């Protein structure tokens, strides 16, 4: 049986794969698993539910809320708000669980559900497996009378609580910094511009008018050309691009050059080391982190640890080792002292704080590492499980690694959220990386 949970919750085409009946069952099962030990002395467990603006969000929120209420859980709806805000609010409200309804950077027709435990932590695999296990075994009857959970619509102070949290996390004045922010017509459309303005920056917001259908449509972190053009048009000091649920952030310098998550991590790691804030002088990245990040961290006397792709795995390593900075090339940056998950708005504030504190431009700060040419090709496949062990793929990888030697690397991995296999090649020059990646992708496509 195919596992329901992927690397970032449950995700699929809304109303076909991710249906209201499935959301109802998920809500009930998650409530049962996550709140079973909280029902003492008649106490009623509490859940926080947020969503991004896509059209199917209300439908799924209603179904999820009904499922949780059927298990005796009070549900507090916090409306359209970023994923990291739901994680924060789960802890801030003292709730027993949190739920975010979003498919992140995926197209509008998709949607997803991700759960947080008490304290705002993403769930480990074994807890997700337990939720799946009990989905079809819960009795149809639940609590009755006073035992039924309530649904509290749209908590009025949720956004203000989150904004105050961001202000406390990064108190540096950003006065004099001019920024373009692309909110992807998503969950950060209101919050991100407000947070940057509150810190003193001059903000030009684009793609910040969601209409339920335009989330991620030719905008946001997957269409970086939009913020690049806007930065050049407005003469801004930098641009920031968020994804649909605003747990990631990519940046653009004043000349329109992309600054990815690896470069952001490099500049923040060096700054935190200088300030004595980089615990154990260690940064946590993933297997997709550019080889240039490893080289830069070695030169700075910082240890780079790598995990599987997915900010949940970065988080697990951060928590297990007691480290203070981690993230992904895609722009998920995690600062455990200020949050339990990747937070695009917090990342944006941290980048600008570093600019304000040093007086340097983003382009200058990004020189903390040299990005080696990297080519990534997504190959549609029908069965991700057989690719890496197929003899023709094994032979093609060996041939590529022999050609690259110590000047590059090859990584093949299955997407955790889509029916894709990702082929990544780093090399001394772009053309070599492109040629080898194309060759490998052709082999994968034929399997």
Curated annotation (Swiss-Prot):
EC number(s) per entry: 5.4.2.10
Keyword Cell inner membrane in record: no
Record's cofactor remark: Binds 1 Mg(2+) ion per subunit.
Cofactor(s) in the UniProt record: Mg(2+)
PTM annotation, UniProt: Activated by phosphorylation.
Binding-site residues, Mg(2+): 104, 243, 245, 247
GO cellular component: a single term: cytosol
Sites bearing Phosphoserine, chain numbering: 104
A GO BP annotation: UDP-N-acetylglucosamine biosynthetic process
One family name in Pfam for this protein: PGM_PMM_I
Active site (catalytic residues): 104
Catalytic activity: alpha-D-glucosamine 1-phosphate = D-glucosamine 6-phosphate
Record keywords: Isomerase, Magnesium, Metal-binding, Phosphoprotein
InterPro entries: A-D-PHexomutase_a/b/a-I, A-D-PHexomutase_a/b/a-I/II/III, A-D-PHexomutase_a/b/a-II, A-D-PHexomutase_a/b/a-III, A-D-PHexomutase_C, A-D-PHexomutase_C_sf, A-D-PHexomutase_CS, Alpha-D-phosphohexomutase_SF
Molecular function terms from GO: magnesium ion binding; phosphoglucosamine mutase activity; phosphomannomutase activity
Role played: Catalyzes the conversion of glucosamine-6-phosphate to glucosamine-1-phosphate.
Family: Belongs to the phosphohexose mutase family.
Protein name in UniProt: Phosphoglucosamine mutase
Highest classification ranks of the organism: Bacteria, Bacillati, Actinomycetota, Actinomycetes, Mycobacteriales
């Amino acid at each position: 049986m195919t596992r329901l949970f992927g690397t970032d919750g449950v995700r699929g085409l809304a109303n076909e794969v991710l249906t209201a009946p499935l959301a109802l069952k998920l809500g009930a099962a998650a409530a049962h698993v996550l709140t079973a030990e909280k029902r003492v002395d008649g106490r009623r467990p509490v859940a926080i539910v947020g969503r991004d603006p896509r059209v199917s969000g209300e439908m799924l929120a209603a179904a999820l809320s009904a499922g949780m209420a059927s298990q005796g859980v009070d549900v507090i709806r916090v409306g359209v708000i970023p994923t990291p805000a739901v994680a924060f609010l789960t802890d801030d409200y003292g709730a027993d669980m949190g739920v975010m309804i979003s498919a992140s950077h995926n197209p509008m027709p998709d949607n997803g559900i991700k759960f947080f435990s008490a304290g705002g932590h993403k769930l480990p695999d074994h807890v997700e497996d337990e939720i799946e296990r009990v989905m079809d075994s819960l009795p149809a009857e639940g609590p009755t009378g006073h035992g039924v959970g309530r649904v509290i619509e749209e908590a009025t102070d949720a956004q203000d609580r989150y904004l105050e949290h961001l202000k406390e996390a990064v108190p540096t004045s950003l006065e004099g910094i001019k920024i373009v922010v692309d909110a992807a017509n998503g969950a950060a459309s209101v919050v991100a511009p407000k947070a940057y303005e509150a810190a003193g920056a001059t903000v030009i917001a684009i793609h910040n008018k969601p209409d339920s259908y335009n989330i991620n449509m030719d905008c946001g972190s997957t269409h970086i050309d939009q913020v690049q053009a806007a930065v050049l048009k407005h003469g801004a000091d930098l641009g920031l691009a968020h994804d649909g649920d605003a747990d990631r952030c990519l940046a653009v310098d004043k000349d329109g050059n992309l600054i990815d998550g690896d470069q952001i991590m490099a500049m923040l790691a060096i700054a935190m080391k200088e300030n004595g804030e980089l615990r154990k002088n260690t940064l946590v990245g993933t297997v997709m982190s550019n080889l240039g990040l490893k080289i830069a961290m070695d030169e700075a006397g910082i240890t780079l640890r790598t995990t599987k792709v997915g900010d949940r795995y970065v988080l697990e390593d951060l928590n297990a080792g007691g480290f203070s900075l981690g993230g992904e090339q895609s722009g998920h940056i995690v600062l455990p002292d200020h949050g339990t998950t990747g937070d695009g708005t917090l990342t944006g504030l941290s980048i600008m704080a570093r600019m304000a504190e040093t007086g340097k431009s983003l382009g200058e700060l990004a020189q903390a590492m040299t990005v080696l040419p990297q080519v990534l090709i997504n190959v549609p496949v029908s069965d991700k499980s057989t690719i890496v062990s197929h003899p023709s793929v094994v032979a093609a990888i060996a041939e590529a690694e022999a050609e690259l030697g110590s000047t590059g690397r090859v990584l093949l991995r299955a997407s955790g959220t889509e029916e894709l296999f990702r082929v990544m090649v780093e090399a001394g020059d772009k053309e070599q990386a492109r040629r080898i990646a194309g060759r490998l992708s052709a082999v994968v496509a034929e399997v």
